């Protein structure tokens, strides 16, 4: 063989090796994408088979173009072009699957509530940490949280290496009066109570008058609620055939993480997957109902129940409507705003024109809103004649608009990365991954349309003592028993595989 022939043969051999390498890389990328999609477990089996078959056909086609030893330039070029495209798409699919898995792992199955005992001093105080306040007189609220706070105080005493001087007061008002009157130098309170303090006359500016110098973790109330639920039978139902209830909570946390706090959005999502029926049932935040952590059944605002953990709010609503609440989904206000921006805004209908507290103009009719505007629309109550009742209805309009937007067209695909980023750290659910996967598979398999109806119970304005702020009367809303009974009847209808429509939803 001449030198020229040897050189050409070597070139052909090297080119063939390169083409084989390109094909192998494509094959590996396809295999990894298929494995990731299979492991995510959200694609129905028939679609996964179709996807696998399509990838196999593409691999075979590129093999015909790339693997023959003697391949023409045009054929090789077409093969390389096609292989690179498939490789890129497979890598993108793998990245999306990994991103989805990371986000899902961060939000699924969370059942614990984070709470802390905050040590507060007056804004002008010299202390900047717990050590600076070692010799201070500390004030606590007497009563219901004594066990949890006793453990927190013991932990702080261990840190300080000394016994703390602690005085106890009957109720929030008495504690704050003593603190700002100079009887004690610092407060030890549940950090979530700051919002409650600002409901009290004379302390609306509480945040600006104090500084937080230390936080001590509080044990969860979950053990108390688990004890209450110990004798309940296990549901043992199929998520794709039997009705279930999700508690949707809008956390009153304004920062970038979820924490134990009041809940301004309290909606039960009653679902019958067999009849494709969903009921959004709103309960006003100030509804005056028994607080589950009170052994005596002392009444409280519904929003205050969130201070003791999301499980407490779930149990309070379960008792109100005499229904088992199976799961929760919690989103904080920051997450609510970023999610709406991630899907490109929403459109909601308002019966009335008004200006929100954040100075956004809402017109009578359709309104296209970004995240900040939608959040302001959902929060507003002071400029609405129906107050909390109207706010609850608007919150459900926003939720409905988000569902409509996310299930329409290519919203999920084109805004995928932003949606995933908006959920991480802002959203939590107790629904297991296996059940989320089952629901996703069911929906993708039948692509059914869901009938979504909404109902908001109403009530009567009043003033009364609450479990979370004993000794002080706060604004509350006494339940409208007729509305509660209507809501229970609608839940029973859905449970019995019945259907509710716009015509059958009771007026209120």
Residue ranges and their predicted role:
Residues 1-9:
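Short, Lys/Arg-rich, polar N-terminal cytosolic tail immediately upstream
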Residues 13-22, 66-82:
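N-terminal Sec-pathway targeting helices
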Residues 17-65:
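Membrane-embedded alpha-helical segments of integral membrane proteins
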Residues 32-39, 65-67, 89-99, 198:
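Short hydrophobic alpha-helical membrane-anchoring segments
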Residues 58-69, 79-84, 194, 266-272, ...:
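Short N-terminal helix-initiation segments at or just after the protein's N-terminus
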Residues 74-97:
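Internal/C-terminal transmembrane anchor helices
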Residues 98-115:
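Alpha-helical transmembrane signal-anchor/signal-peptide segments
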Residues 108, 112, 120-123, 129-131, ...:
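Non-catalytic, solvent-exposed segments at the cell envelope interface
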